[in-house]
Amino acid sequence: MLQSNEYFSGKVKSIGFTSSSTGRASVGVMAEGEYTFGTAEPEEMTVISGALNVLLPGETEWKVYTAGQVFNVPGHSEFHLQVAEPTSYLCRYLK
């Protein structure tokens, strides 16, 4: 079953799904902007196209991730994103 989600007044949209190859996941697109997301469980984020400037929990420096790169976010935390161009991503929930 597919589940559509919309955040930040429609600037971030995703479709949640479960498959045998990825487990529970969502794929989405972010418009230009700055966003803060909270996590309930650990997440693995893969940039599909574009780029994300990311500030992970406990870090003091932002890091840019581009197409094909992956970063992990701990559960029960917040992370910050700066998006300079429309960017697509895959988020896998690792619980």
From Swiss-Prot:
InterPro entries given in the database record: Ppnp, RmlC-like_jellyroll, RmlC_Cupin_sf
Record's keyword annotation contains Nucleus: no
Name a GO molecular-function annotation.
purine-nucleoside phosphorylase activity
User: Which Gene3D superfamilies does this entry report, sorted A to Z?
Assistant: Jelly Rolls
A cellular component term from Gene Ontology for this protein is: cytosol
NCBIfam families assigned: PRK10579.1
> By what name is this protein known?
Pyrimidine/purine nucleoside phosphorylase
The organism of origin for this protein: Enterobacter sp. (strain 638)
